[in-house]
């Protein structure tokens, strides 16, 4: 859109960062790693607390002046937008183990960092759900399902996994597009708008799959309320595997799509990969 | 480049109105601050051998697949419930279409142009922004993607899908086919006009908000058109979206109205292309050097 008139033979106008090492011992001694983990913890806590609170509030008022299902979808999408905006520069603004997983597969973050992020996200989600429970009271919280993800009646577990998978694909695909150095260099709208399409991707996925699974697409978000509701016995607990398997599979698929089809390996096989599409 | 700031500030054309139409641009050709790309050839054999051509097709397929999957699933979620208050409602459907177009145009604009819509491809082809082969390839990939997307939604719950209209576009009772056609034409005009404005070389050079925001007004145009015309036709403005749902739903009353959702968008896209190229930009009147 912005660039695009250059011929393919000139030097590249962008630089791909080198792949992150699997284990980077140097970063373990740095404050910035721990600061990033704390930022992930806080952001996930806020995300889960506010969004679960919206879900419980809507169910308590059921239809009379509540935020409505559209309001729930906006709570998730809007919070992701705001929190990615705030934390992108500190930790990358993942707030989602599936996104972190995709980033490991793409070699953008090292393994210890990813493990630390995932832990921080899960702990943050549990604390956030606990905070929401405290706000609404244990009885009300449990009566309205605790904002946990579970499969709606009439849908098979397979449908739930596919719904989670495609939903996470949309999200992670958007994240990859927003953080791609090549796209950033070519289209001026990519770096400027970045958090907005990520938030709106979350919004539209919620609009689509709230009736099926309540929409996880974030294993930490599903884990938090399920743990706070109680171990072992609840429906949310027995369905929890769907909200880990689906998102991770979707994230891996998005990474493969972006990395191999849109960016990398397959293109190199063609000699004339320099042809540019007419930019829109 | 003198007067550019003034031009940007006013958002107006910098040539004085006393100059006759068309000649102004020729006279000032040497100090233009933008470059109009040459028209795409009808058939370009070179691009058939490039990976980026097929990658763009795959990107269109995946984008249309995701678009149909998310939006039809939202429509299903709304229409299966007896009370609209317990669902995301019509506004949620409109957000689903508009938000998805925004996110997908953002993601695929740099790969394929991010059309996701045969009407947009057709409009841009009329303006000679892509070759005929590419346009046909895109449209085929968009339609295939749309069919797959609607198919996955049907796979989730077949009875529910068939019992609730399958998200197919039909003209609502109380409206004539002419009403539906008019709604589709105007709706697509708004969308394609926005696309042309967002991709215009001159506007991109003059107004900094044009290239930076590009996907956002396109998504909003789709959102607003859906708010307006969901009660009339369910809002197509995208022949691939209408075709995908119609093929998977496959009932007579959906097929009877189906031509509207091809004729309407294509006419609207053609009008927008003519409006933008001839009236706004006067490109046919300019000599190309």
UniProtKB/Swiss-Prot annotation, chain A:
Region of interest (Disordered), ranges: 1-21
One term under GO cellular component: plasma membrane
Membrane-spanning segments: 36-56, 70-92, 113-135, 156-176, 192-212, 236-256
Single GO MF annotation: water channel activity
Keyword Transmembrane belongs to the record: yes
Annotated disulfide bonds: none
Membrane topology category: Multi-pass membrane protein
Top-level division of the source organism's lineage: Eukaryota
Subcellular location: Cell membrane
Keywords: Cell membrane, Membrane, Repeat, Transmembrane, Transmembrane helix, Transport
Tissue specificity field: Expressed in leaves and at lower levels in roots.
One Pfam family per UniProt: MIP
Locus of motif NPA 2: 218-220
Motif NPA 1 location, chain numbering: 96-98
This protein's domain notes: Aquaporins contain two tandem repeats each containing three membrane-spanning domains and a pore-forming loop with the signature motif Asn-Pro-Ala (NPA).
Protein family membership: Belongs to the MIP/aquaporin (TC 1.A.8) family. PIP (TC 1.A.8.11) subfamily.
Protein task: Aquaporins facilitate the transport of water and small neutral solutes across cell membranes.
Protein name per Swiss-Prot or TrEMBL: Probable aquaporin PIP2-8
From Swiss-Prot, chain B:
Keywords: Cell membrane, Membrane, Repeat, Transmembrane, Transmembrane helix, Transport
Spans annotated as Disordered: 1-36
Its membrane topology: Multi-pass membrane protein
PROSITE patterns: MIP (PS00221)
Annotated SUPFAM superfamilies: Aquaporin-like
Subcellular location: Cell membrane
Conditions for induction: Down-regulated by osmotic stress, chilling, drought and treatment with gibberellin and abscisic acid (ABA). Increased expression in the recovery (post-stress) phase of gibberellin and abscisic acid treatment or drought.
Tissue: Expressed in roots, leaves and anthers.
Keyword Transmembrane among UniProt keywords: yes
UniProt motif NPA 2: location: 238-240
GO molecular function term, any single one: water channel activity
Major location (coarse): membrane
Transmembrane segments: 58-78, 93-115, 136-156, 178-198, 212-232, 260-280
Family: Belongs to the MIP/aquaporin (TC 1.A.8) family. PIP (TC 1.A.8.11) subfamily.
General function of this protein: May function as water channel to facilitate the transport of water across cell membrane.
Protein name, as recorded: Aquaporin PIP1-1
Additional remark text: Recovery of PIP1.1 expression after chilling is increased by pretreatment with mannitol.
InterPro entries: Aquaporin-like, Aquaporin_transptr, MIP, MIP_CS
Record's comment describing the protein's domains: Aquaporins contain two tandem repeats each containing three membrane-spanning domains and a pore-forming loop with the signature motif Asn-Pro-Ala (NPA).
Motif NPA 1 positions after renumbering to this chain: 117-119
Top-level taxon of the source organism: Eukaryota
Biological-process GO terms, alphabetical: response to water deprivation
């Amino acid at each position: 859109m912005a660039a695009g008139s250059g011929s393919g033979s000139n030097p590249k106008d962008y630089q791909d960062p080198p792949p992150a090492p699997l284990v980077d011992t140097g970063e373990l001694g740095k404050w910035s790693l721990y600061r990033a983990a704390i930022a992930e913890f806080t952001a996930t806590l806020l995300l889960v607390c506010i969004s679960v609170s919206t879900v419980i509030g809507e169910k308590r008022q059921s239809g009379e002046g509540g935020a409505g299902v559209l309001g729930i979808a906006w709570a998730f999408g809007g919070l992701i937008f705001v929190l990615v905006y705030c934390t992108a520069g500190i930790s990358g603004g993942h707030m989602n183990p599936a996104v972190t997983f995709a980033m490991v597969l793409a070699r953008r973050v090292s393994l210890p960092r990813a493990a630390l992020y995932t832990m921080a996200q899960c702990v943050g989600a549990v604390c956030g759900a606990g905070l929401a429970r405290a706000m609404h009271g244990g009885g009300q919280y449990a009566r309205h399902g605790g904002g946990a993800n579970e499969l709606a009646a009439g849908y098979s577990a397979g449908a739930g996994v596919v719904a989670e998978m495609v939903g996470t694909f949309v999200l992670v695909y958007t994240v990859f597009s927003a953080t791609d150095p090549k796209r950033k260099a070519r289209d001026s709208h990519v770096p400027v708008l970045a958090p907005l399409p990520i938030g709106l991707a979350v919004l539209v996925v919620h609009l689509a799959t709230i009736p099926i699974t309540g929409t996880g697409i974030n294993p930490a978000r599903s884990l938090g309320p399920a743990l706070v509701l109680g171990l072992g016995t609840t429906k949310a607990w027995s369905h929890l595997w769907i909200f880990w398997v689906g998102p991770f599979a979707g994230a891996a698929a998005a990474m493969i799509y972006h990395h191999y089809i849109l960016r990398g390996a397959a293109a190199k096989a063609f000699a004339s990969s320099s042809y540019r599409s007419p930019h829109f | 480049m003198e007067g550019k700031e003034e031009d940007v500030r006013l958002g107006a054309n910098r040539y004085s109105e006393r100059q006759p139409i068309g000649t102004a641009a020729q006279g000032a050709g040497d100090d233009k601050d933008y470059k109009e790309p040459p028209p795409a050839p009808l058939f370009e054999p070179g691009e058939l051998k490039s990976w980026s051509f097929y990658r763009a097709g795959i990107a269109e397929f995946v984008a249309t697949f995701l678009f149909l999957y998310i939006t039809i699933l939202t429509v299903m979620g709304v229409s299966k419930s007896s009370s609209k208050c317990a669902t995301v409602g019509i506004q949620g459907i409109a957000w689903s279409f508009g938000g998805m177009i925004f996110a997908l145009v953002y993601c695929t604009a740099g790969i394929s142009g991010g059309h996701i819509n045969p009407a947009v491809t057709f409009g841009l082809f009329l303006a000679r922004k892509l070759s005929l082969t590419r346009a046909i390839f895109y449209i085929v990939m968009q339609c295939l993607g749309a069919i797959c997307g609607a198919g996955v939604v049907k796979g989730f719950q077949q009875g529910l899908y068939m019992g609730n209209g399958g998200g197919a576009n039909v003209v609502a009772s109380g409206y004539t086919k002419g009403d539906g056609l008019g709604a589709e034409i105007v709706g697509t005009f708004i969308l394609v006009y926005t696309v042309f404005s967002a991709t215009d070389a001159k506007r991109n050079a003059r107004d900094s908000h044009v290239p930076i925001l590009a996907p956002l007004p396109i998504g909003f145009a789709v959102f607003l058109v859906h708010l307006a015309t969901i009660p009339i036709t369910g809002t197509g403005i995208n022949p691939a979206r209408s075709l995908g749902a119609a093929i998977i739903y496959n009932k007579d009353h959906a097929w009877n109205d189906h031509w509207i959702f091809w004729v309407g968008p294509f006419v609207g896209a053609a009008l927008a292309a003519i409006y933008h190229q001839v009236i706004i930009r006067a490109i046919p009147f300019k000599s190309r050097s």
